Amino acid sequence: MLPKIAVVEDEEALSVLLRYNLEAEGFEVDTILRGDEAEIRLQERLPDLLILDWMLPGVSGIELCRRLRQRPETERLPIIMLTARGEESERVRGLATGADDYVVKPFSTPELMARVKAMLRRAKPEVLSTLLRCGDIELDRETHRVHRRSREVRLGPTEFRLLEFLMSSPGRVFSRSQLLDGVWGHDIYVDERTVDVHVGRLRKALNFSNMPDVIRTVRGAGYSLES
């Protein structure tokens, strides 16, 4: 599963630029143009890092940052404040409100990308790791290779993403709709039964030579990967 970055920026051209550069660095990006919309979206799906503009319609970035820090589920969310306010007093205010870093516009795109990676290394090193392990299964994000008990498992691209998603939270039960969002994305319409087809293919690939089945079906709930 790709590291998720949420960008809350009301300048559409800048939002597009940030999405392009972040996706080129291997991140999954969700762009939001309004502060009030961001507050709702962040409750529905929590990113690994938030890039937040100060001046936003609906709810200001500084107010949104304050609210996020008051909630248990977002109190540790890495936040980079992105703003044209470069005065020392404003930087101090942004950091005191809860931002972890403060970048003043105009900014260097390569420097911002470096700051994003540095913050993720500190706050969530697991999301940048190329190697995932769960039980006797090993998945390498960089080489797109999977091994079980040292034997290579051949997977198609969808089955690879599905396994990666399940391995990101071993033991957690994901509904079909959650798997669709996490593996196929929000903007692609796929019937929920498609999930069953790909889970079946993944099972078949992993369970060679009478290997124990590590994918658990929870009736009426979804699927999980046994750890």
Curated annotation (Swiss-Prot):
InterPro entries: CheY-like_superfamily, OmpR/PhoB-type_DNA-bd, Sig_transdc_resp-reg_C-effctor, Sig_transdc_resp-reg_PhoB, Sig_transdc_resp-reg_receiver, WalR-like, WH-like_DNA-bd_sf. Keywords: Activator, Cytoplasm, DNA-binding, Phosphate transport, Phosphoprotein, Transcription, Transcription regulation, Transport, Two-component regulatory system. The modification 4-aspartylphosphate is found at D53. Residues 4-120 form the Response regulatory domain. GO terms for cellular component: cytosol; protein-DNA complex. GO terms for molecular function: phosphorelay response regulator activity; transcription cis-regulatory region binding. It is found in: Cytoplasm. Phosphorylated by PhoR. Residues 129-227 bind DNA. This protein is a positive regulator for the phosphate regulon. Transcription of this operon is positively regulated by PhoB and PhoR when phosphate is limited. This is Phosphate regulon transcriptional regulatory protein PhoB. It comes from Rhizobium meliloti (strain 1021) (Ensifer meliloti). The lineage of its organism: Bacteria, Pseudomonadati, Pseudomonadota, Alphaproteobacteria, Hyphomicrobiales.
